Amino acid sequence: MLSENTINIVKSTAPLLAETGPKLTAHFYQRMFEHNPELKDIFNMSNQRNGDQREALFNAICAYASNIDNLPALLGAVEKIAHKHSSFLITADQYQIVGGHLLATIDELFSPGQAVLDAWAEAYGVLANVFIQREEQIYQDNQSQTGGWRGLREFELVEKQYESAHICSFVFKPVDGGSVVSFKPGQYLGIYINDEQFENQEIRQYSLSSSVRPDCYRISVKREEGGRVSNYLHDHLDVGSKVKLAAPAGDFFLDAAPTAPVVLISAGVGLTPTLSMLESLTEHQAPVTWIHATENGQQHAFKQHVKQLVETHPHFNSLVWYNQPNSDDKIGDDFQFSGWVNLHEIETVLKQADVQVYFCGPVGFMQFIAKQLLEMGVPEQQFHYECFGPHKVV
């Protein structure tokens, strides 16, 4: 329990942190990687270069300082981060390293005096313990389940299939021949790549793109321009290749009552977690609406698969938007609408009582979707979203 004095001191530093901006976290990361270069094997260095990770950490630090007297407000963020940390196999001793560099950064940038440093040390220690305990619980839960494991497990690529011009599916089975731990539709898998072409180990999380299978996992990866790992997987990972995986994790997952209508909204490769959800809703007792946006038919992944699911399950419905249809794309067959997704055109679907909405895609797309949902009066607690990469609020 934090003392009132600590709470007051940390809260008083919030305006200074906000004024400093991401310069704070840029200094922190530069310092940490200089003194502990081994941590480059854990952090996504691409997110370091584009600034996304710095921005995410800065927002988290500011949120903690501002809400230190109202920690329940941070529980959602803690759960999201703890799951991501478990996929990176973060350990308790690494929290000590990070804490040391955070305090040194505050001291070097602001010279705030020992009282402020002591307050932040106490506050960081409390928060670190919350994460350590929650992450240990996640590790133990995974390990204790049938097919579960802790740490890394070696898998073999047994199937590789292109779903569109830029999205490829990869199916992995454990080398030891055992079963695999179950997951919640919408969760992701941690994949660890060690290759001589990379200076450091590369770790990525990719959404599981199928319903639960007892002996394998499927991810579907978009080839991103300049994406180090996505291009590596597309170009160098072939059937028979071995990779190491961390157990499934993630706080974005299907959690709808059996009688609640479900709407799944995605753009581009954002369909991977929602497809896992769709495949898991074949016995659902309420209507399920699949809404997908993509550029055109060439970019439309899993088109036939979703069409077959809809045809064989009367409670399923599919609505597709093509931003710029090709000449051979057929309206009414390949897609129903063109341009940007306009949810007001299908307002009755979103205004069903107790509807649960799950959406995923580029940040701009999700912000646009969230804005429309709020305009239509869908309560915030009834929509759920996932950001690929460092979390952003939509």
UniProtKB/Swiss-Prot annotation:
GO terms under biological process: cellular response to nitrosative stress; nitric oxide catabolic process; response to toxic substance
Active site: Y95, E135
Residues annotated for NADP(+) binding in this entry: G268, V269, G270, L271, T272, P273
Residues that bind heme b: H85
InterPro entries per record: Cbr1-like_FAD-bd_dom, FAD-bd_FR_type, Flavoprot_Pyr_Nucl_cyt_Rdtase, FNR_nucleotide-bd, Globin, Globin-like_sf, Globin/Proto, Hmp
Molecular function as annotated in GO: FAD binding; heme binding; metal ion binding; nitric oxide dioxygenase NAD(P)H activity; oxygen binding; oxygen carrier activity
Binding sites annotated in the UniProt record for FAD: Y188, R204, Q205, Y206, S207, C387, F388, G389, P390
Domain FAD-binding FR-type: 150-255
Superkingdom assignment: Bacteria
Reactions catalysed: 2 nitric oxide + NADPH + 2 O2 = 2 nitrate + NADP(+) + H(+); 2 nitric oxide + NADH + 2 O2 = 2 nitrate + NAD(+) + H(+)
Cofactor annotation remark: Binds 1 heme b (iron(II)-protoporphyrin IX) group per subunit. Binds 1 FAD per subunit.
Keyword set includes S-adenosyl-L-methionine: no
Class of this enzyme: oxidoreductase
UniProtKB keywords: Detoxification, FAD, Flavoprotein, Heme, Iron, Metal-binding, NAD, NADP, Oxidoreductase, Oxygen transport, Transport
Record's function text: Is involved in NO detoxification in an aerobic process, termed nitric oxide dioxygenase (NOD) reaction that utilizes O(2) and NAD(P)H to convert NO to nitrate, which protects the bacterium from various noxious nitrogen compounds. Therefore, plays a central role in the inducible response to nitrosative stress.
Domain notes: Consists of two distinct domains; an N-terminal heme-containing oxygen-binding domain and a C-terminal reductase domain with binding sites for FAD and NAD(P)H.
Protein name: Flavohemoprotein
Source organism: Vibrio vulnificus (strain CMCP6)
Gene name as annotated: hmp
